[in-house]
Amino acid sequence: MFYLKKYQKISMKILMSKNYFQVIRAGINTTFQDEGRKNLYHVGIPFSGAMDKRNYFLSNKLVGNKINSPALEFAYQGPLLKYFGNKINIAITGDVNFRIKKKDITIDGNCYQSLNLEDGDEVDILSTNKSVYGYLAIGGQIDLKYQWSSCSTNTKAIIGANDGKKLENKQVINISKLNNQSVERKLNYINTKIENIRIIKGTNFDYFSDKGKKIFLEKEFIVSKLTDRMGMRLEGPKIENIIDTNIKSEGLIKGVIQVPADGNPIVMLSDHGTIGGYPKIGVVISADYDKLVQLPPGYKIKFKQVDLSSAENLFKLYDLETQNLISQIE
């Protein structure tokens, strides 16, 4: 009996000292993401990972994590989380409206800086501002399940952290290890939007008529409401195909633009399938992908063609800019 009581006391002590977040409101589409699953296309496993890699990396750096640590990605409206435990730091990146609710005061939050939470504090992510995705990094190690060396959640394939599901109300996010909370980090950064999305020719570019190519490269398209982590549907003038709208299925990559029978292009995003049978007219260059995924429904875009060498150089420049931003965070 003595040992049972002693065990119960120890168990309660462990429970009370545990650091965790209680999910009060899960948000519209909140998932755990990291860099994604590399080198698995050949076995039918999508890449997944954070949609906007730059903002994801910055969120982790601001809380002192390795930049490829798991973080929460949310779309439009984020979660309302209540924290229990020792002091912890968080950071939110993107163009996001949020509040920190403490015992006696509610504070409007600022993105791109580390923020301390204490026992009983709440973080309420209200909305993204004329954009889609935001990131919440937690300073420490989140208890998560990994599959194929990644915790990235793909809800269509039902793989990754949280049993492949979106965050749900009332669930708990356990933190097994905390970072040093005394270091304050901040970055002066403003997200910008682009209207011209640069692309290279797709492997089936010549399957389209001259008129279809002209429409693709000169006309405006509107981001559809039928857009998710798997693909971005675009609405606008129909792109004419001169061979066949259904071809032998081929491998897909992130950013490739397929054109189905209705003539409306679809950009493959991070959770896309690994093969597809629609002609591929173009591929969004890697340097523009982060900004593309942040464009909300109703936003107008145009495509601009560049050659492969330019696409490679533009990505090197974008990657260098990202690394410079990371290095500015002490």
Where are these regions (language model features)?
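Conserved "landmark" site that anchors the functional core of diverse proteins
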Residues: 2-330
